[in-house]
A protein has these predicted regions:
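Loop/helix patches that line or flank the sugar-binding groove of alpha-linked glycan CAZymes
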Residues: 6, 231, 238, 245, ...
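C-terminal beta-strand-rich structural cap/linker in extracellular carbohydrate-active enzymes
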Residues: 527-543
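Beta-sheet entry/capping signal
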Residues: 47, 92-94, 186, 195-198, ...
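Acidic/aromatic-lined carbohydrate-recognition and catalytic surfaces
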Residues: 2-183, 187, 191, 202-257, ...
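Beta-strand-rich binding/interaction modules
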Residues: 500-520
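Extended, hydrophobic alpha-helical segments in both membrane/secreted and soluble proteins
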Residues: 197-201, 338
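Flexible loop/turn segments at secondary-structure boundaries
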Residues: 56-57, 103-105, 204-209, 246-251, ...
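Active-site clefts of carbohydrate-active enzymes
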Residues: 209, 307-327
């Protein structure tokens, strides 16, 4: 495999609205991010994935873009953006822009003109259909945010298509003029000096509406190859696609270098395992064996013909320590264990802001405290269909996107040092105990565990390129594996439970003196025939 710079990089995702507010309007901004670059340098990351900061009416917190080449005033200006890129570059950090090209805002000039003039060149930039015989929607396709994916436009006497909110009309990727406009815009950003793109719901751009195909349409991969050739293909940029329905087979189509599409994709098979019947509002406990089967499958099947992205959480998902670990008694131990589990795998790790200090889910008491459009839409859809308020709030507490979007905890001052104004969303009340200032003062904190994991990846090519060999595949409580190349042999052992686990080690690991590279509890220097892992214990040793 040809080595690329992003193979041994670690990416840190920033959700700007909730990261750091420099002007005290309650909304995080670009100058706030600039003020924290030294913190990120201390952590050791070398890429920032920046959630959208483009001009937007913020119906979906910036994932509804009204101008791709302007910065939303609440985040700052293009001068601030250039300053961020320059100061990040001085610290060896690249900026990956979050790009949404499946849809735009309904306030984008393209859509405004398409709506106002049926003869406009922009009319066919979007998907319009006549009503059915009785005025009904053209099909029963549903919006990902709940309800129908069709919105009636009274003035035009037609429906337009929106897979997300009605204020996020889908672009018509069957129109070559759309390709050209999007590719020109992408090249403009590349010329500004960005390090790559995270492509939002990119598996939807090949949709075939009249066949009711939304994801993974036949045109998807030819479109991505066209995008690659026209924009980032020869620029050595990191590109990662959000692909909710990806399998290892389709992930190879996206990320095999020979196909000239993307660097890697985000797959969500390990995420949806914790949804009952695929419904995120019906959470279910972690089945570790099922989870391991998914992770092992992805590690083995992409080992030579693609590249994995490694992540636990992001701006759309609940906090990792609350979902997969224990956010109470064993918060610190389980957060470190989960970090080790992920960062020793083969692929590019992603850290979501606050993950490195063990931030937890929030359980707001009232629906009114939630700001997320998906949460509010689905609350109405579900309760209208008979789901009780109590049941729905339980699902919201577990899986609302706002779990990830409460402000970053910088210290124990008012509003956690995020702002001196009134924050756009309430804080998690545990910020006095869980914050950056506390973490930096404690050499045994979760933060320094992440710092060490990042350093280990940089120092040990076996973590980046070595073979992945599963251990104890059927053990219901332990996720263990080996990483091996011609020079090094690592063993990674992780207890996912609050009970001690006794392992009978295989013969090739028995009676060995070992070097402990990282542990969340006491280090191990000798492997006998048996090993006891205490609750949430995690060990990485080198033979």
């Amino acid at each position: 495999m040809e080595k690329r710079w992003w193979h041994n990089s670690v990416v840190y995702q920033i959700y700007p609205r909730s990261f750091c507010d420099s002007n005290n309007d309650g909304i995080g901004d670009l100058q706030g991010i600039i003020s924290k670059l030294d913190y990120l340098t201390t952590l050791g990351i070398d890429v920032i994935w920046l959630s959208p900061v483009y001009q937007s009416p913020m119906d979906d917190n910036g994932y509804d873009i009204s101008d791709y080449q302007a910065i939303a005033a609440e985040f700052g200006s293009m001068d601030d953006m250039r300053e961020l890129m320059q100061k990040a570059e001085q610290r060896g950090i690249k900026i990956v822009m979050d790009l949404v090209v499946n849809h735009t805002s309904d306030e984008h000039p393209w859509f405004v003109e398409a709506k106002n003039n049926k003869n406009s060149e922009y009319r066919d930039f979007y998907i319009w259909r006549d009503a059915g015989e009785n005025g009904e929607a053209p099909s029963d396709l549903g919006s990902i945010f709940g309800g129908t994916a069709w919105e009636w436009d009274e003035e035009n006497q037609q429906y337009y298509f929106h897979l997300f909110s009605k204020r996020q009309p889908d672009l018509n990727w069957e129109n070559p003029a759309v390709h050209q406009k999007v590719f020109d815009m992408m090249n403009w950003w590349i010329d500004q000096g960005i390090g790559g793109f995270r492509l939002d719901v990119i598996d939807l751009i090949g949709k075939e509406i009249d066949k009711k195909i939304t994801g993974n349409g036949d045109r998807l991969h030819p479109l991505l190859q066209q995008m690659n050739q026209a924009t980032f293909g020869n620029k050595d940029l990191l590109t990662v696609g959000e692909t909710w329905d990806a399998t290892p087979e389709t992930a190879q189509l996206y990320s095999n270098p020979a196909r000239n599409e993307l660097s890697m994709v985000f797959q969500f098979e390990h995420i949806t395992l914790l949804w009952e019947d695929g419904d995120k509002w019906k959470p279910k406990p972690l089945d570790l064996n099922a989870f391991k089967q998914v992770m092992i499958k992805w590690q083995l099947e992409l080992s030579n013909n693609g590249w994995n992205s490694l992540f636990w959480n992001n701006h759309d998902l609940p906090r990792v320590v609350s979902k997969y670990g224990c956010d109470g008694q064993y918060r610190v131990e389980s957060a470190k264990m989960l970090a080790t589990t992920l960062h020793l795998l083969k692929g590019t790790p992603y850290i979501f802001q606050g993950e490195e200090i063990g931030m937890t889910n929030v359980a707001f008491d009232t629906l009114e405290e939630y700001k997320d459009i998906e949460t509010l839409n689905f609350y109405k859809v579900k309760t209208d269909s008979g789901v009780s308020h109590e049941t729905m709030m339980k699902g919201i507490h577990a899986n609302s996107r706002d779990n990830a979007r409460t402000p970053m905890h910088w210290d124990d001052s008012a509003h956690a040092g995020f702002t001196q104004g009134s924050p756009w969303i309430s804080l998690n009340p545990n910020f006095p105990e869980i914050n950056v200032a506390v973490a930096l003062e404690d050499t045994d904190s979760i933060f320094y565990h992440y710092q060490k994991l990042i350093a280990l990846r940089k120092q040990n090519p076996v973590i980046v390129y070595g073979d992945f060999i599963p251990l104890f595949e059927d053990h219901p409580a332990v996720f263990a594996y080996e990483r091996k190349d011609a020079d090094q042999h690592l063993v990674v052992l992780n207890n996912f439970t609050a009970e001690s686990q006794t392992l009978t080690l295989p013969e090739h690991l028995t009676d060995k003196e070992v070097e402990c590279l990282i542990a969340n509890l006491d280090p191990v220097t000798h492997l006998g025939s048996h090993l006891v892992l205490t609750p949430y214990q995690s060990i990485v040793v080198r033979l």
